[in-house]
């Protein structure tokens, strides 16, 4: 049995929209996803229970999860849409935020090999 950190919570795409003519950028994010990435980079086996869709934003999340060696729980990729957090920056530097997310994680069993369970943000 390999000891595992079991992480529960949102993964999303951070959309940063600066004032024109700056380009809008998109980055994988979400506090629980970031925790899973950090633990994996520290050498801990990590399993993530999250929700994202089979869409363009979901592919950003999936690529980030896979490139960091995080194990996804079954059905993590079955959401209708992938959550986004959009930050719009005004020319004076003020930011306004819009969150487009739902949280509908199905019932989960904590894996026997989990030595720690972390829930974050929306999951808590």
Segments (PLM) and residue ranges:
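Glycine-rich phosphate/adenosyl-contacting loop at the front of the ribokinase-like
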Residues: 1-71, 85
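Conserved N-terminal subdomain of the carbohydrate kinase-like
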Residues: 45-121
